[in-house]
């Protein structure tokens, strides 16, 4: 019913795969079944910082698809809408972090475009996504803002241990 089609030859589609069909979901059942085992720490993994920076265009594509899939407020139950806005804010922030970590001025413009595209797709969705604390933190302006975000990533990586 959802018409889900994953972009071909693209990493990070799990964000989109677990997001786009939600408006059609009537019931969720958790199965504690290990369908695959993910080995963290292997060289060249798609979640390593340097790999994610190299593949940031794929993160951006997934983000664009997620924006397109986000329902307008009032068209789905409020709890679902809030969840989807929360998920979109997180994924948009992840993409923004790696655009900033790249230290590429063209990617800084792409980060600004990412947030502008959300606003353009729907002012209501843009407003709701930007209200999230993580979204506000990732939109600190200028070189000082980018420095704070880079340092924040380093601290968060040490505390949480993403990679």
Role assignments for model-derived ranges:
Residues 8-9, 73-78:
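Short helix-to-loop capping/linker segments positioned immediately adjacent to catalytic or ligand/cofactor-binding
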Residues 83-98:
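Amphipathic alpha-helical repeat scaffolds of TPR domains
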